[in-house]
C-alpha cells in the first residue's frame, strides 16, 4: 500500500513545477464537527485548483453518521483524493479511507 501512495505522490510531483496539493488531517475521534471541516477543505482545494487532496488519517473511528457525511463529501470531490493511513484507520476511519 505504501508503494502505491509513494508512486502516486511521485507522479503528482513530477508533472509540474508549481502544483498545489492539500494535506487534510483526520486524527483522533471522528465526530460531527469534522464533516464541515472536510467539506470546507475540499471546497478550498477546488477553488485553489489543487491537483489533489491527501487525507492524513490516524483514528480509532467514531460516529458513523459523521463518517458517512465525510464519505459523501469525498466522493463528490472534483479532484483526486488520496488516503494516507498514518498508523491506523479503524471503523469510521476505514470507511473514510475507502472513499478516497
Per-region residue spans from a language model:
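Sec-dependent N-terminal signal peptides
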Residues: 4-16
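Soluble extramembrane regions of membrane proteins in the secretory/endomembrane system
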Residues: 18-100
Amino acid at each position: 500500500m505504501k508503494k502505491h501512495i509513494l508512486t502516486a505522490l511521485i507522479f503528482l510531483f513530477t508533472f509540474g513545477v508549481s502544483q498545489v496539493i492539500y494535506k487534510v488531517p483526520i486524527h483522533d475521534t471522528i465526530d460531527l464537527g469534522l464533516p464541515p471541516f472536510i467539506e470546507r477543505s475540499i471546497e478550498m482545494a477546488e477553488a485553489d485548483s489543487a491537483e489533489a487532496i491527501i487525507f492524513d488519517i490516524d483514528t480509532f473511528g467514531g460516529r458513523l453518521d459523521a463518517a458517512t457525511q465525510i464519505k459523501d463529501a469525498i466522493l463528490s470531490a472534483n479532484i483526486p483524493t488520496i488516503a494516507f493511513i498514518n498508523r491506523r484507520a479503524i471503523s469510521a476511519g476505514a470507511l473514510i479511507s475507502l472513499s478516497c
